[in-house]
Amino acid sequence: MSIDREKLKRSIRLFLEAIGEDPDREGLKETPDRIVRLWEEFKSYENFNMTVFEDIGDYNEMVVVRDIQFYSFCEHHLLPFFGKAHIAYIPEKKVCGLSKLVRVVNKFAYRPQVQERLTAQIAEFLEKELSPKGVAVVLEAEHLCMSMRGVKNPTSYTITSKLTGAFMEDEKTRNEFLNLIHNGR
């Protein structure tokens, strides 16, 4: 779905007026256009298609990409949450380019979202596209809706995980993944 640029610009102007700001003052004049460009950039990731390689030889060990920086917006307050994603999978017959894992995170992060759903969507997408022996996704994030408002606790991080296949069923595999993302620095 594309963005209704004019409707979004009008809405941002109305929002600024509603909170007592002058949308025509210096510093805010271009804000509606900036917001439109931000959301157009975010929406551009929705159409990402995963490139998959099926000739992987005999490789059947864990593939891990950790510390993938991500940004999203809490769907309850429209405030940012951001942090790091750690992703692993064990190939069955398919692999993807490592940068594609970053794009998968962005595909689901760049929208109003909750961290729990984001974690599950990443894992489910990789399961569907790669048919691996297992997928592990851990997200660590600071939520500005907790840091700036409400409890005002800027030192807390939310950690969510989604494990499938070998990562869920085999404690040794799960522990190897957790060790790699926490101690392998």
Swiss-Prot record:
Its EC number is 3.5.4.16. It is an enzyme of class 3 (hydrolase). Pathway: Cofactor biosynthesis; 7,8-dihydroneopterin triphosphate biosynthesis; 7,8-dihydroneopterin triphosphate from GTP: step 1/1. It catalyses: GTP + H2O = 7,8-dihydroneopterin 3'-triphosphate + formate + H(+). GO terms for biological process: one-carbon metabolic process; tetrahydrobiopterin biosynthetic process; tetrahydrofolate biosynthetic process. Zn(2+) binds at residues 74, 77, 145. GO terms for cellular component: cytoplasm. Pfam families: GTP_cyclohydroI. One of its GO terms (molecular function) is GTP cyclohydrolase I activity. It comes from the Bacteria. Signal peptide: none annotated. Keywords: GTP-binding, Hydrolase, Metal-binding, Nucleotide-binding, One-carbon metabolism, Zinc. Homomer. NCBIfam families: folE (TIGR00063), PRK09347.1-2 (NF006825), PRK09347.1-3 (NF006826). Belongs to the GTP cyclohydrolase I family. This is GTP cyclohydrolase 1. The lineage of its organism: Bacteria, Pseudomonadati, Aquificota, Aquificia, Aquificales. The gene is folE.
